[in-house]
């Protein structure tokens, strides 16, 4: 479901934003890929995915604890 929302928003943005702003289009393509990969994971792998992503973006060791019941 989240993937479809991101794809719809990306399509709307691609129609509204001129082609000169290719970075915005690239951002949404990357977001679609990230959401697609995220939805293929199970609940425990999702927390590891965000730990890795956030630590890569911030440059610091980020730990999100999983409270899966």
Swiss-Prot record:
Membrane-spanning parts: 16-36
A single cellular component GO annotation: host cell membrane
Subcellular location: Host membrane
Superkingdom assignment: Viruses
Residue intervals annotated with topology Extracellular: 37-69
Lipid bilayer topology: Single-pass membrane protein
Residues modified by glycosylation: 51
Membrane topology (Cytoplasmic): 1-15
Keywords: Glycoprotein, Host membrane, Membrane, Transmembrane, Transmembrane helix
Family label: Belongs to the asfivirus X69R family.
Protein name listed in UniProt: Uncharacterized membrane protein X69R
Origin species: African swine fever virus (isolate Warthog/Namibia/Wart80/1980)
């Amino acid at each position: 479901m989240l993937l479809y929302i991101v794809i719809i928003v990306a399509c709307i943005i691609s129609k509204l934003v001129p082609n000169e702003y290719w970075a915005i289009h690239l951002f949404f393509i990357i977001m679609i890929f990230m959401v697609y990969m995220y939805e293929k994971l199970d609940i425990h792998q999702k927390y590891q995915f965000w730990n890795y992503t956030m630590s890569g973006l911030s440059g610091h060791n980020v730990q999100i604890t999983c409270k899966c019941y």
